[in-house]
Amino acid sequence: MSINENTMEFDIQKNKDDLTRSILSEVNNSLKEKGYNPINQLVGYLISGDPTYITNYNGARALIRKLERDEILEEVLKAYLSIK
C-alpha cells in the first residue's frame, strides 16, 4: 500500500454548491412528477418562504428546507449568469 504524499484540499464552497444543485434537481423532478410547474412553485417558495409551495412527494419539501433561500438564489444566479 502506497502513501499519498500530496496534500488533499477540501473545497467547502464546491461541496455546498453541488448539494444545492442536487437538491434543486430532486425537487424539480418531484414537482414535475406531481404535475406542477417547478419554476412557478420554486418562485412562490423563494418569495414567500412558505414550504407548502413544494410538494411532500419524494421528500422534496424536507429537502428544500435543508437549504437557505439565499443559497438557492445564489446558485440560480450563478447558473443564469454563467459564473462558476
From Swiss-Prot:
InterPro entries given for it?
A: IreB (IPR009309)
Q: Which Pfam families match?
A: IreB (PF06135)
Name the family. Belongs to the UPF0297 family.
Report the protein name in the record.
Answer: UPF0297 protein NT01CX_2279
The organism is: Clostridium novyi (strain NT)
Annotated PANTHER family: UPF0297 PROTEIN YRZL
